[in-house]
Amino acid sequence: ISVRVDQNNMIITPSGIDYARLKEEDLILMDINTLEYEGDLKPSSEKDLHAAIYCAQKDINAVIHSHPSYCCSVAAAHAEVPVKDTKWQSLLGQTIKTAKYALPSTVGLANSVMRKKKDAKGCLMANHGVIACGKDLDQAFEVIYAMEESAREYIEENVKKISGKEEFDVESMIEIFVRKYNKGNKER
């Protein structure tokens, strides 16, 4: 997780520290242009990606890298997610893109994400996770939530296609339920 402090600096979480035990003094001030920082703790291994986003998008003030389950499943398939829910389209656009695989924690990953993400607020990373950004942390968290919901819907839709099962007919289900469970009547 990182937050832009000004046009040249971000505060970023350290690598290898449990967020539940994180203290304010553990946060690292880092120059987004040079990646220089002070202190004994190492910054997040995805610092290159965070910095690349801040350098490219001046309106972004918060970046979150995470590994939500549905998004990671889609990213492992190197698929892109159509955003069908209109309430998320204004935040995510019509499609959540997936960046080509690159080794984690490398400039190569940052470049791959930036090529695919462009001005979008979120992007899947093949075989890795997601990156989400926003004007503030609240919006960045909302982007992750919207991405995960969209990925869930996409997976559920595709499981139906893979299984060959159609959506069940609600009217038929009600009829079966009433016939089978209606008190006092024998099952027909």
List PLM regions with ranges.
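Glycine-rich flexible loops
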Residues: 1-188
